[in-house]
Regions:
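Terminal helices and disordered tails flanking the catalytic cores of nucleotide-processing hydrolases
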Residues: 1-12, 218, 253-286
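Conserved alpha-helical "signature site"
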Residues: 1-169, 173-248, 285
């Protein structure tokens, strides 16, 4: 793993410059950066989103989808903020940003699987947080961001990455070595570096870098632990990042949850799968 010690990234790994990773949509990044500012005004968020008409249109479309299921459809960004709240808007804009970042690559089945896994992880993280004590908006946002390194590798080298995913089988962790062999970096390392390069909130760095590391038995329940379980639940619920992904049995995943979350969460993988699929489908057809 990379060490966040202030070294020049090219000095850490000379292949970083070679990757030539494309920038993330500016508006989505700015919304996420503003989210950490307690003094931000709602009109600032509205003006920022509205400054990019295509982005604003996509935000409104998804805001009115089954993903958020508002009681009253929003016809403007101001209304969307009023209906959904500023906190939900952060995760929504990041979701729109990820979809825009992948662009036409989403037409490829392997890329669509990566996208669906990412969104499934975010939705599961949101649900787990809703029955526990962690912040739902932060959990959803962390879920969307957890595989940002994988998304970046997929976008910059789509053909090679699809071939890698198609040929690989094993645990989600085992693919990291295959990525390092091909790119010089794995998606956790790339994600950690992008948190810095894109000036994202630094508290997401350990989540992005360590989301494949399961919680130890005596460790407290935390956001990184929630994302780790959510990521594997996404695989089990029918949204694996690659076809040969090793699946953890759902009862085993439930056993990893704290008592409160375990008692209030979906008792069967079938009910979880149906709900997640319905919400993702609503975004894809929006």
């Amino acid at each position: 793993m990379l060490q966040n010690d202030g070294q020049n990234k090219e000095a850490i790994n000379p292949s970083w410059a070679y990757l030539r990773l494309p920038p993330f949509p500016h508006v989505a990044l700015r919304v996420l950066q503003l989210a950490s500012n307690e003094n931000v005004q709602l009109h600032e968020l509205s003006d920022l989103i509205s400054s990019d008409p295509a982005f604003a249109s996509e935000v409104l479309t998804i805001a009115n989808s089954l993903l958020y299921a508002p009681r009253f459809p929003a016809s403007s960004i101001q209304q969307a903020i009023a209906v959904l709240g500023a906190n939900n808007l952060h995760g929504l804009c990041l979701t729109v940003g990820v979809r825009a970042y992948m662009g036409k690559n989403l037409n490829q089945p392997c890329m669509r699987a990566v996208w669906r896994h990412n969104l499934a992880c975010a939705l599961i993280a949101d649900q787990l947080a809703s029955v526990g004590s962690l912040d739902r908006d932060v959990a959803y946002t962390a879920g969307v961001m957890h595989d940002i390194g994988r998304l970046a590798l997929a976008v910059v080298r789509p053909r090679e990455y699809c071939l890698l995913l198609g040929a690989h089988s094993g645990s989600p962790v085992s693919i990291l070595k295959a990525e390092r062999d091909l790119f010089g970096w794995d998606h956790c390392e790339v994600g950690r570096q992008l948190i810095t390069d894109w000036k994202m909130p630094p508290e997401f760095e350990p989540i992005v870098a360590e989301h494949h590391q399961p919680r130890q038995k005596d460790d407290p329940w935390s956001l990184p632990a929630l994302i780790n379980v959510s990521c594997r639940m996404a695989d089990t619920a029918g949204c694996p990042a690659f076809a040969g992904c090793e699946i953890t049995p759902y009862p085993d995943l439930l056993d990893e949850l704290p008592e409160r979350e375990r008692g209030l969460f979906h008792a069967t993988v079938e009910t979880l799968s149906a709900e997640i699929a319905r919400k993702i489908d609503s975004v894809e057809t929006a």
